[in-house]
Amino acid sequence: MTKRIRQPIIAVLGHVDHGKCLLPDEKVVVPSVGFVTLKELFETASKVVERDDEKEIRELDERITSVNGDGKTGLVKASYVWKVRHKGKVIRVKLKNWHGVTVTPEHPFLTTKGWKRADQLRPGDYVAVPRFIHGNEDEKIFLSYVKVKKSGEEWKEYFYLAGRKGNIDVNLLFVAPKRYVVEFLRGYFEERSEVKGESVIVEARELVEPLSLALLRFGIFSKIQGSKLIVTGKRNLEAFKDYIGFKDEREKALEEAIEKVKGSEVYPIFEEIRRLRLLFGFTREELGSYAKYENSEAPTYEELMEILDFIERGSPSLSKKIAILEGKLKAELRVLEEEGLIKDGKLTPLGRELLEVWRNREFDSKDVDYIRNIAETLVFIPVENVEEEEYDGYVYDLTTETHNFIANGILVHNTTLLDRIRKTNVAAKEAGGITQHIGATEVPIEVVKKIAGPLIKLWKAEIKLPGLLFIDTPGHEAFTSLRARGGSLADLAVLVVDINEGFQPQTIESIEILRKYRTPFVVAANKIDRIKGWVIEEDEPFLMNIKKQDQRAVQELETKLWELIGKFYEFGFQANRFDRVQNFTRELAIVPISAKYGIGIAELLVLIAGLSQRYLEEKLKIEVEGPARGTILEVREEPGLGHTIDVIIYDGTLHKDDTIVVGGKDKAIVTKIRALLKPKPLDEIRDPRFRFDYVDEVTAAAGVKIAAPGLEEALAGSPVIAAPTPEDVEKAKQEILEQIERVVISTDKVGVIVKADTLGSLEALSKELQEKEIPIRKADVGNVSKTDVMEALSVKEEEPKYGVILGFNVKVNEDAEEVAKAKDVKIFVGNVIYKLIEDYEEWVKEEEEKKKRELLSKVTFPGVIRLYPDERYVFRRSNPAIVGIEVIEGRIKPGVTLIKQNGQKVGVIRSIKSRDEFLQEAKKGQAVAIAIEGAIVGRHIHPGETLYVDLSRDDAITLLKHLRDTLEDTDIKALKMIAKVKAKEDPFWRAI
């Protein structure tokens, strides 16, 4: 069989880049809190994850509005809120007739021409604004906020009257369910608005900001003019009529305005219209009157929908165009030349590509759905002005699973190191180009050579690798996945550490993963651009860039590097700057970089390539014709394809029609591949978000989407094995089942419930729990369900500290959340394994302390006292008797009952006094006066007599079983003395 070296699989772990921040007063809508500034949100989060002089990170458990990959808005979890020190420029971006937002220069905004940094925006650029903002719809959360009970009808009346008065806690516009908020809006608009021409105009005054966003809960986009809000445009007026409306003469005026108005917001997406037109086989001429929307006139929402409907039907003369491009027809050459498909009688690259697309009919409704979603969900507003100013203080940011959120009604975004590596495609397009795989990004070695140039000479040998395959998924998934031959899915890793901030929780987590799976790695010491006085040259190699720095900046870099080197030493690693490393098998290489400006990326790529070839060559040799092996990254449903699996193939070649065996929930799934799909190249015609290339085979290493029957139950993280023969199928089934059975747990024992997103992460979490001797009742893949909560509840009844759910990188289903709240079942979710377990252990400790405090408040402690023999210490003989005593063992408190040596009760201690001070407790050795209710000196008690605190059986059991560690030696002695007294009447006490 033919062997060749495949490209290494690289995972990126560690620091999440949070250089892109907003000023403290920028606001977000948080359904459980309201309309709050980022600073206020930070202050509500009490759990500090990390803190130093430069930044503070706090854990957050809130949901906020974000835009997902389909272009739709929804609520996503915000898991952390950051406060970061910033000294330098900030950019104020003000949109026309809308809000503004102030951000750090590198913060990206979504425009009609893709993501643009704040410092690259210019007046006239169109920026994305949501048409929908999501508030709270949960009555319980609302009632928890207002702390007042009213019926639904009473609340509606309250909100309506508040609207008429124009007075409300603005947070209620987002914390209250829509059914109440709409009543406020009705009252507000009834009292203050007019219908003028084709608009509804309301005087909003100080409510202009929150009111404009509250209207977005109903899909009503408004314009801001001073203190006025203006609702205009067909779909906004229609939504206003449907949700709010009028009950007087304005109702008719509103209907007339809707009739008169011609359209809604405009969408200047000229390039997208051209792309779709060509994809569906139309020339500009065939587009007729719609052609003007391609470069000169932006269509309204309604016009855009018409264009999309027209294009979606496809060109009736497509077969003719195919024949022309194939050279079978000579007609209409001029038109296709004008479109750039033919030049000098030959097909252009665009012409060749379109011929393939048209022949295979590789276009359908999915190609226009994304644009439809964008138009339904977002509005593009022109930038009015961009101002730059100096700022010295704190800036804030949020960590969300979608890397974007809505601030001040504007979509803002975060990016990663991998995004910067992808950007090198622009500079090196002619060198082969970076291609997008399913779940991975391939960087051909030609691109590495183009970027690195003379740096390749550092390795004194030709690089033979075909390229590098970067895994797109979160770092942990690259490692915590089952791989039959052992080890991790990644061959090599890049650990990203902020050189200014040092180690963070995810850094430590990543190091533990790398150590556990014995994965070689290099360190990218990011954000050197933030070193004071650092001279920036975009995309420059580090070794060239450092020569431009003054001595002070170089010295600061050296200091920070030594701090990092010291930290790695604590974890058992010898580390050094990459160009000073003598032996790469013994020393960890640190590459100083700026992901933001591309400094040092060249060295990083060359280092990865060189190390992979030098030290991993044998591991990277694969049997080209051998059966494929891979790992499932994700299971998802695709329109027209059904359930599919996204797989990284790390060995062999996978063919269309191969029989494969994959891991399922409780079985091995055997199925036949119906289609192998890879994303199309990132070009102007085909959109990789929704379009795939159908391929006949893929060879390792590669990311691929597999469509096949019966994949509904497939598990992320499980193996995929190609099986050419029935014997291979049985062997693969056995192998996969053994791995699943090793990880998925289902027992009747008392233990925690564990859920994870993949089999591999489930295995990793379970192992950590077992190492800490935390028992597991059930471990499975998937979101937290209602069944999981009920299972945890049954455990809770037996042992409260184990009646919990630990979820790694999973969501909690809505019904599960409701039951968990109602039944008080604790659910821990997170995306850092050790942090998840740490949180659980901390909670157990708190619960045990709480339980101990409760027991301490209820239990009676043992105590033995002796009355002084001298009559002078009898201060009162009765009602109550007051006598001087010494505590000879244990302790006494007011409220305890005293007994004699024969077990007879003599009375209750009402108070304890030492000189002029009343005490709540007296311990061994203390001499005090006590008041005894019910005792008479001379009849029931006598000077010199020994008395004992009366304990119940429950007291004794609680003290010995649950509070043993709180008992002092003297308490134990007192307990034994009391037990001796009580054993005369009750045999139970003889055992103590």
From Swiss-Prot:
Gene Ontology molecular function terms on file: endonuclease activity; GTP binding; GTPase activity; translation initiation factor activity
Biological processes, Gene Ontology terms: intein-mediated protein splicing; intron homing
Binding site for GTP: 472-476, 526-529
GO cellular component: cytoplasm
InterPro entries, sorted: EFTu-like_2, EFTU-type, Hint_dom_C, Hint_dom_N, Hint_dom_sf, Homing_endonucl, Intein_C, Intein_endonuc_central
Domain DOD-type homing endonuclease: 96-220
Post-translational modification: This protein undergoes a protein self splicing that involves a post-translational excision of the intervening region (intein) followed by peptide ligation.
Keyword terms of this UniProt record: Autocatalytic cleavage, Endonuclease, GTP-binding, Hydrolase, Initiation factor, Intron homing, Nuclease, Nucleotide-binding, Protein biosynthesis, Protein splicing
Residue intervals of the tr-type G domain: 399-616
Record Pfam families: GTP_EFTU, GTP_EFTU_D2, GTP_EFTU_D4, IF-2, Intein_splicing
Miscellaneous notes: The intein interrupts the GTP-binding site.
Family per similarity comment: Belongs to the TRAFAC class translation factor GTPase superfamily. Classic translation factor GTPase family. IF-2 subfamily.
Function in brief: Function in general translation initiation by promoting the binding of the formylmethionine-tRNA to ribosomes. Seems to function along with eIF-2.
Protein name: Probable translation initiation factor IF-2
Source species: Pyrococcus abyssi (strain GE5 / Orsay)
